[in-house]
Structure formats: C-alpha cells, structure tokens
C-alpha cells in the first residue's frame, strides 16, 4: 500500500536581514522562497542560506507561518 503524504509539508522561507533591518531604504521588499520539508526529520524551524535579491547577497532565510 502507498504511504500517506502528510509528513512532507510546504513552508515559506523569509529573509531575516530584510525583516530585522526594517527593509533598507534602497530595497523594495522582502525576499521569500517556497520549499518543502519533512516534518518527521525536521520538527523545528527550517533555516537555509539563500540569495536575497533585495539585499544583493546570500542571507539566512527562516521558516515563517503561512
């Protein structure tokens, strides 16, 4: 039998430096990525290094609630 797919969920990752800095004067928004994670393997909040087009560098993107 096929296993249920309830362990893998879709999450939003948001740039922490854009949010913390209150969005710089030259930036026009907040970078967000959509990805999936396995709830059983990663029960805590997910944090990944991603490129932020508003900060023009690689920053930590943390999981947020939908």
From Swiss-Prot:
The keyword Zinc-finger does not apply. Keywords: Chloroplast, Plastid, Ribonucleoprotein, Ribosomal protein. One of its GO terms (molecular function) is structural constituent of ribosome. SUPFAM superfamilies: Zn-binding ribosomal proteins. GO terms for biological process: translation. Pfam families: Ribosomal_L33. The keyword Methyltransferase does not apply. InterPro entries: Ribosomal_bL33, Ribosomal_bL33_CS, Ribosomal_bL33_sf, Ribosomal_zn-bd. It is found in: Plastid, Chloroplast. GO terms for cellular component: chloroplast; ribonucleoprotein complex; ribosome. Belongs to the bacterial ribosomal protein bL33 family. This is Large ribosomal subunit protein bL33c. It comes from Vitis vinifera. The gene is rpl33.
